[in-house]
Amino acid sequence: MTGEVVVVGDLLLDRDIIGVADRLCPDAPVPVLTEMGTTQRPGGAGLAATFLCLDGLDVVLVGAIGTNEAGDTARAMLEHTGVGLVEIPYDGDTPEKIRLKAGRHPLLRLDRGVAVGRFGDLPVDAVDAMRGASAVLVSDYGRGVTAMPSVRRVLADVARHTPVIWDPHPQGATPVLGAILACPNRSEAAAFSAAQGADLNGRPVLNPAAVAAEARLLRSVWRVGAVAVTMGPEGAMLAEADLVPVTIAAPVNHQGDTCGAGDRFAAAATLGLARGRTVRAAVVEAVAAASHYVETNGLAGIGSELAMEATT
């Protein structure tokens, strides 16, 4: 493998407020959370970049970071982890996803700073990083970076000779022509397929045949090399050109904190493709990595390299 791995996409700040809920509010039937501490980390493309950095790769993140406190915090954490940053000029805020949790159990999610600002010109350093990468992971969180015409032109050109992996979002852009792998989750695949006039999935019950049909449809519509639809504890459904879709089973089936599991899958698949694995081998490794991540309690199991704690 030569060259850095580049992550392109939307940066967020994720925060967990953790406490104890042992009573109800007197004026409404809702729990009262007694705050014990907070944990924060880069989210979105920042989390994917952090995973790759913790996997031992040299990583550059190309994205927009706001000038608010959340942006400053995310920037500092990424730099501490060793992720290189090439920032796209941006006059908006970095959004926050805040989970309120009683122990390990989420009670509520609060989103802040969701308004999208304006982007400036794509820096030359960003173009150079993408063109020189051993692989590019596009981490789309629907904030607009992947819809920038300048970004899409470079990615389409890079995809001709370099693995481009696309982790899509329902409010985001479609993958560029020639991306080697797109990896929507099950609900995203159903939504994307419905947008094409198809209603293939018998939700909420998992229907493997319908998921396979969605994967085939999206691979054809997006004109990408392969589509892997992630299915949580059931693994992933992989559709490649001229091959019957196959289920890549998860090695373990544990229920845990799945927050970040999709980013873990995308990062692990990118790692495999950057190292020259076949798409199928990379997806097998990605399913195993995501499964292990959930089995070891997700973000809480990673340790201080990722989760920066601030007790209150």
PLM regions and their residue ranges:
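Conserved N-terminal subdomain of the carbohydrate kinase-like
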Residues: E4-V5, L13-V138, G303-T312
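Short beta-strand/turn micro-motifs composed of small residues
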Residues: G9, G63-G66, P168, M231
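Active-site metal-binding loops of divalent metal-dependent hydrolases
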Residues: D10-L11, Y141, R264
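Short glycine/proline- and charge-enriched loop/turn segments
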Residues: R23-L33, N185, A198-N201, V246-A250
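Short, small-residue-enriched loops and turns at beta-alpha junctions
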Residues: A115-R118, R143-T146, G172, Q255-G256
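Conserved phosphate/ATP/ADP-binding segment of small-molecule kinases
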Residues: R143-P245
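Conserved post-catalytic alpha-helical subdomain immediately downstream of the catalytic base
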Residues: V221-A226, D242-V246, A250-T311
